[in-house]
Amino acid sequence: YWYPLYEKLCELDVVAHIHNTGSLRQREPYTLQFINEETTCIYGLLNSKVFDDFPTLKIMVSHGGGAMPYQLGRFEAGTIRLGAKDPKQLFSEKMKKLYYDTVLYTQDAIELLVKTVGVDRCIFGAECPGTGSQVHPKTGKPLDDVAQLVNNISFLNKEQKEDILWRNAVKLFKLDVDAMKKAQPKNTESMPTGSKAAGGGGH
């Protein structure tokens, strides 16, 4: 029953954003619900014929794709067990059909996401206000200082970091960079490479 939505998304050439809602279940509260449901959603999408039927469909998933990058090996094994022989059918390749925001709070998590799906599938995201606004007692910094984490990825060059921080979003959402520059206050940088890279709070 989602097909009419997919058809319209492709017709308009716009991006769908998957972000779970909260939970009323004590066993699966808030953040855990986000991760579990986003993981389940990705699994269902990539094991369906949605991208066969809508090859131009663009979907971005919040929170780095839930648990998917971390558990990729299990899902990879599952596709092989079910008969996947063409490399394009492997779950690791299917993962690259989606886009993922960088709302992750550790260096290891950000780096795993990039290694799993590639630079071109990572879109800078921040969560302020949100869970990540909390200040870590050990570092004294907000957990959601994601731009710093991206800039600290040692295996990426400057251009690749800028791709994640702003250039990928410009391409995906077809943003008018010149108009954005003109709209910026005079006391800000023309193209930010730090925490302002995606324009503020939310994903």
Regions found by a protein language model. Name each.
Residues Y1-P29:
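Extended, charged catalytic domains and RNA/DNA-binding interfaces, predominantly
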